[in-house]
């Protein structure tokens, strides 16, 4: 499934479970597009791929690109021109009954997009800014904020 606006095109890659979840989340995906459009400052339209991956795959990516040999929740990769990729570990978004948790899914998507659009959390101020934007996004799409104020 793809979502598109003047600033970016996002393609989601995953199994049939993800496709079903995305079809049931069209309203939130539309709001995702609305929320992130003004935060994306690149003049060119950006192509973004968001892929749900296994723990083994994200661990391998984390080791290769960040030199950390451990599983993580989300990784973002930008080529600085007009595209980017986000990998999300399935273990961080699946409920015990193996369905996708909306809260976790949209939080990690927002976190990855903020990184692609130039935001970071390397110090207290940047972490506070990022958490604020993540909380505002979650409220905007009708979900609970994930960070305490």
Where are these regions (language model features)?
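An acidic/histidine-cluster motif and surrounding catalytic segment
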Residues: 1-108, 114-149
């Amino acid at each position: 499934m793809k979502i598109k606006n003047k600033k970016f095109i996002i393609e989601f890659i995953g199994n049939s479970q993800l496709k079903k979840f995305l079809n049931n989340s069209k309203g939130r995906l539309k709001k995702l597009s609305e929320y992130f459009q003004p935060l994306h400052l690149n003049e060119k339209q950006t192509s973004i791929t968001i892929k749900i991956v296994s723990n083994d795959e994200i661990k391998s990516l984390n080791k290769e690109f960040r030199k950390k040999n451990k599983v993580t929740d989300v990784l973002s990769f930008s080529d600085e021109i007009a595209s980017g990729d986000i990998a999300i570990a399935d273990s961080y978004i699946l409920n015990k009954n193996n369905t996708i948790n909306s809260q976790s899914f949209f939080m990690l998507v927002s976190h990855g997009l903020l990184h692609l659009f130039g935001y970071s959390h390397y110090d207290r101020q940047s972490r506070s800014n990022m958490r604020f934007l993540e909380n505002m996004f979650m409220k905007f799409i009708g979900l609970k904020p994930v960070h305490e104020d």
